[in-house]
Regions:
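Hydrophobic residues in well-ordered beta-strands that form the structural core
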Residues: 214, 235, 293-295, 369, ...
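Short glycine/serine/threonine/alanine-rich loop segments
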Residues: 49, 66, 231, 257, ...
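Short, conserved active-site loop motifs that form the nucleotide-linked donor/cofactor pocket
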Residues: 188, 291, 321, 409, ...
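Conserved core of the PLP fold type I
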Residues: 145-289, 300-318, 389, 471, ...
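N-terminal basic, amphipathic alpha-helical segments
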Residues: 1-146, 351, 355-362, 370-373, ...
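Short, solvent-exposed loop/turn elements at beta->coil junctions and helix N-caps
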Residues: 327, 448-452
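Active-site PLP attachment segment
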Residues: 301, 308, 314-349, 364
Length: 505
């Protein structure tokens, strides 16, 4: 039944009130195309008005194209144009594309594409940044859930503090101590994944027109957040020891940045680990010029060889480092729990943003993760994950090596992390390669997606080895090589993508 409330003391005529009420319901979609309106006699009786008042109201709606008379059905909501459900003929729908912020429009959609590619039948994807779902300790978490106390079971249905579930903050503080970072639970905040920390840092420190310094090639998710904020990103060249800190100080003098963003350990996409000497030099420059450092460390515990290097936060002499990390890369992607360790004023400001954004992280996930850490399950799980990923890394490297002389690709074997950063000959026909890879049902991420300053490195591709099933790695490498050979046979020698094109193939 359609309910209409009339204001009989209003100066607006009753027929206009009736017409307006129906018009609002049709425009909002509450009344859909083909919905029958009450008969004139029934509506007049229900509203206590003359039938002529309803006749006049329906006449207004018909004249405006909102309703029409149909034989055998009476007055119904008019047919609509397109798929605009509730928008009658003659009424123009909003032109949404013209209303979007230009900054939001510049944001890429690589993550959605990655999810789509991974779901395509028969595709072997090296494009993702995902962990291996088969390594999730499902039985452990099921047992932890069964063994929750009555108090914990009740707490799952309650909100947690904005800064995070107190016991979990304490557990994270202990975990940070194992990484050499001195941070009390008050210095820790739980996040909905570490990428939320990137967003909060941008909203806290940056304004349109500001400058961020980062590695020349870096995490595309961070680049999208910075660029959507109207910020200019300046890339610092890298070598095998990480960011070229000999160029950093001059860049700080020249650009007066508001933030330095870095992934110093098993960097995404290069897999490079910044040397200890470079870390001290970076911190020294940041301290001298008063520039905060945002350290992103999602892969630091995934070491398969080499000697450990302390996080920047563990070496920080002046408290200028904001440290981000996550459990998503070592557990599973759907477990969107990350954390930040930072000085109290930063935690306070992030907490305000968290309260405005999503109040707090999912309470059941926080409780279960805390029990997982306190129960001593984290270290053995890490050992299992490291062993599996080391094996996958080596298998991919060996598979690619079989085609090295034929294709001319090359890479450095990283000591940890998720990725091989593979170079191709400078003359390589990259556009043809992307097309042939798609035809051969194999996926990767191309170098331009990671370019900080918009200067594409067209002869690079990033290959993820953690998510692809180990049994598919050999075949995936064969498909890549086949696509590369076909590209050289049929390619035009072009090395540049079209403007703005950053395909996943």
């Amino acid at each position: 039944m359609i309910r209409l409330d009339l204001e009989r003391e209003s100066t607006t005529p009753l027929f206009e009130q009736i017409a307006s009420a129906f018009r609002e319901r049709i425009m909002s979609g509450l009344l859909h195309e083909g919905t029958a309106l009450p008969t004139e006699r029934d509506l007049a009786k229900r509203l206590g008005v003359n039938r002529s008042t309803v006749v006049r109201a329906y006449g207004e709606l018909k004249a405006d194209g909102f309703v029409e008379a149909r034989v055998g059905r009476g007055t119904v909501v008019a047919a609509v144009e397109g798929e605009g459900g509730g928008i009658p003929r003659g009424v123009e729908p909003l032109e949404w594309d013209s209303l979007f912020s230009p900054d939001a429009g510049s944001c890429g959609d690589l993550f959605s594409e990655m999810m789509s590619v991974n779901g395509r039948e028969g595709v072997i994807s090296f494009a993702s940044g995902f962990p291996d779902p088969d390594l999730f300790p499902a039985e452990v978490f099921s047992g932890l859930e069964r063994d929750l106390s009555a108090a914990d079971r009740r707490a799952q249905f309650l909100p947690s503090p904005v800064e995070g579930f107190g016991p979990l903050r304490e557990s994270v503080s202990e975990l940070l101590s194992d990484r050499g970072i001195d941070a009390s639970s008050r210095d820790v905040m739980i996040l909905s994944g570490s990428q939320q920390g990137l967003d909060f840092a941008a909203r806290t420190f940056l304004s349109p027109g500001d400058i961020v310094l980062t590695e020349k090639s870096t995490f595309f998710g961070a680049l999208e957040i910075f660029r959507t904020s109207g910020v200019r990103v300046v890339g610092i060249p890298m070598d095998r020891d990480g960011m070229r800190t000999d160029l950093l100080e001059s860049a700080i003098r020249r650009h007066n940045p508001r933030l330095i963003y870095t992934l110093p350990t098993f960097q995404n996409p290069t897999g490079i680990t910044m040397s200890l000497e470079r870390r001290h030099e970076l911190l020294g420059a940041a301290s001298r010029f008063g520039v905060p450092v945002l350290e992103d460390d999602p892969y630091g515990e995934l070491r398969y060889g080499g000697s450990p290097v302390p996080p920047l936060k563990a070496l920080d002499p002046c408290g200028c480092v904001i440290y981000l990390s996550s459990f998503s890369k070592v557990l599973f992607l759907g477990f969107r729990v990350g954390f930040v360790a930072a000085p109290a004023p930063v935690i306070e400001r992030f907490s305000r943003l968290k309260q405005m954004t999503d109040l707090h992280v999912n309470t059941p996930a926080q409780i279960l993760l805390d029990r997982f850490l306190r129960g001593g399950h984290y270290a053995p799980h890490l050992d299992r994950v490291r062993a599996a990923y080391r094996r996958k890394r080596d298998r991919l490297s060996e598979a690619l090596s079989r085609y090295r002389s034929r294709i001319g690709w090359d890479w450095d074997l990283p000591d940890g992390g998720y990725y091989l950063w593979c170079s191709l000959p400078g003359f390589f026909p990259m556009r043809a390669f992307t097309a042939k890879s798609s035809e051969n049902r194999v996926a990767f991420l191309p170098g331009p997606a990671f370019c900080a300053d918009g200067t594409p490195r067209q002869n690079r591709i990033r290959l993820n080895f953690t998510h692809v099933p180990e049994t598919d790695i050999e075949e995936g490498a064969r498909r890549l090589a086949r696509a590369a050979e076909k590209a050289r046979e049929n390619g035009s020698g072009e090395t540049a993508f079209a403007d703005g094109q950053e395909p996943i193939v």
